[in-house]
Amino acid sequence: MIALSFNYKWRPQQEIIASQKIAEFSKVKMIEVPVPYIQQATDLRLEGYPIPSATNAPEGFIPLRNLLFYSIAAYYAEIYGYNFIIGGHIKEDTQTFPDTNLPFFEKLLKLIKESKHKYDNRPIDFVFPLVDMNKIEIIELALKLKVPIDLTWSCYGDFAKPCGLCKSCQKRAKALRELNIKS
């Protein structure tokens, strides 16, 4: 098993550090994939790109993010001989971002399978163990599995500590509050 971390432009440094710490804690090799040309729609707008799809986009939206990331993950699965690509999307993601729902991944998987060499019959599939769970259920599962929640990062901002203002911080804080856990 390997973990992939996509380092796109303006990705929060604390998120990168959290990924590294979790991989180390889990004793999983992490490969950091530089994708400096990928950035959030709001940042692209600031650089002068029109980005029509970002007009009403949710916070953190990156155009075609999962098409790109999962295609790269399929490449790594191919060269390492892995049969599964595991994603961490949760129920709330599927309600916010169009490229996190199962129909999207069914279509993408079909394309990936069609792209594989005709002599390579190894199966490949996506696995999304958290896709039907909300943040509260995920935190409960994390506690049960003794996942070090303090190593995780949810903030969209690039600060030493979570901003507490972005939607991701607010959702995390609400879930922790409902479970009577101090953040």
Each PLM stretch: what is its role?
Residues D158-F159, N180-S183:
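Short cysteine/histidine-rich metal-coordination sites, predominantly Zn2+-binding motifs
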